[in-house]
Amino acid sequence: AVAYVTMALRIAWYKVHRPAAYYCAYYTVRADCFDASILGGTQEAIRGRYKEMEENSKDLTQKDKDLMIIMELVIEMLCRGIKLAPVDLYKSDATKFQVVDEKTIRMPFNALPGLGEAAAQSIVDAREQSPFISIEDLRNRTKISASLIDLLREGGCLGGLPESNQTTLFSF
């Protein structure tokens, strides 16, 4: 019993004194339940989605119930002034949430729904070799599918990457 109390005190200490680190650890452990398309929005949008799910609580799957728990924690985190930075092609980790600063946490690639751990790791491995010059280069070097490219595009990860490796005469 002493071990459980000691662990609870440690967790509580981190939640109060190092909240960004606490939330990073919590979300990383439960990354399979995290959905960046929902949780990366505004506090009002997350609350609205939470209320929708609460109203249909009889029809929820276990994954939806787990997502609701994460939603509660994200809302709490946002109320404490800590925000989620979007997935970034050059800064995000494959599976771990990262503390950017005391008030910002960056989401990993696998926070995007449908982007698995293997695909996320292949993106990280490829970007460590050299920067991506285009979406075509990203796809060729990582071997990820067109649907995952679309997922990255929807998540805002591709920024200003051109579609093709070829440059045009007027692109300068």
Task: Mark where each language-model region is.
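Noncatalytic, beta-rich nucleic-acid-contacting surfaces in large DNA/RNA-processing enzymes
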Residues: 1-172
